[in-house]
Amino acid sequence: GNAENSSLLNSALHYDPLVPVKDESGNYALSPTLGMIPNPVSMLEITDQTQTDRLLANGYIEATFWKDLKVKLNMGIDKNQGRRSTYLPKSTLYGKQEGGKANINENRTVDLLFELTANYTKQLFKERDRLEVLLGYSYQQENWDGLGAGSSQFFTDLFLWNKLEAGNVARPPVSSSKGKNELGSYFG
């Protein structure tokens, strides 16, 4: 039943080529010997939409305070958010077992980077002799959150994932998550 979560190509490779695409009733036929392998043509009716938006930016400011001291501030952001909506209609193997199955998942991640460095360079007695000192601080923060909702046992396939409440499930699957990681360090 869950082989529909693999791939169309996997089903096509393992499906019995002697079985017709549809049976006498007009439903997608299943192999009598490989009933757990979905009809690969039926998988073309699965609706799966993914949208991802990403912002990636970096920048820095550098200043020279004295002839020998440079300070640099480096900042960056990586913001990634996505939404995936899927619907397995009743014409598919797993969709038939579930009475149609819809899922919506959304995730968002924001990574922030902050680095501050100070570089001191002093020419000593001879041209080849010099003193270099680098000190710095680095801070990185990752924030993420997500949510998911689904339903099954729909009386029609027309709604796709747009009316999860139309499913007839006592406890539809709902999930959410949120978290944060931080990392800070001094170096020199």
Regions found by a protein language model. Name each.
Residues G1-R54, N74-S185:
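Surface-exposed loop/interface segments of Gram-negative outer-membrane beta-barrel transport/assembly proteins
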Residues E62-I77:
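A conserved hydrophobic secondary-structure block that centers on an alpha-helix together
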